[in-house]
Amino acid sequence: WLIERFKIERKRFDRSGVYAYTQRAMAYNSNKIEGSTLTPEQTASLFDNGTLPVNDDYYRAKDVEEMNGHFLMFNYMLDTLEEELTENLIKRMHYELKSGVFEDRANGYAIGDYKKRPNMIGMYKTALPKDVETEMRQLLDWYHKQEKSMKALAEFHARYESIHPFQDGNGRTGRMILFRESLKYDELKPFIILDDDRSKYLEGLKEYREHHK
């Protein structure tokens, strides 16, 4: 029923229901985990009206661009919910998130495609650009053979973040996949990772990386 509710409220431009609440909560928390400076109020204003409150302090243009990109990525996720999770679908999620971000485009980052330059998570080396496609294919092949469970989803997410397939936006696309899959399958319950749980969440990913080298 939740998927139908999302679709109905989105079509009606309803800003008072569960669709708008989830859009705001997910965009705020997922971007905040990555260092966004926008508040819940600013996030709500952007989603509801496409503007920021008049009396606001300074804010970073990139934070606004990524917040708007997150709203678009959520809508794309809803539109493609019945499709199988594929590399192309994940790349398109990344495109929705990042195509309007000036800084990423100015830096020559691949948008909607896998990274062209090596990147790291702290001191941890992620998959090299030349290996990303193979590792992503193996990960998706593995995932589609699993019984759908929170355990399989958690392992998928940890492996995805360890690969770090994109130049930037890996956490946000990864958490959107978590939400998508938990929304899609009856065996699972949809959830949002909160910024309040950031340290526990990052610690869990770190633990996985260290024990599954």
Question: Where does each model-flagged region fall?
Answer:
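FIC/Doc superfamily catalytic core
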Residues: 1-213
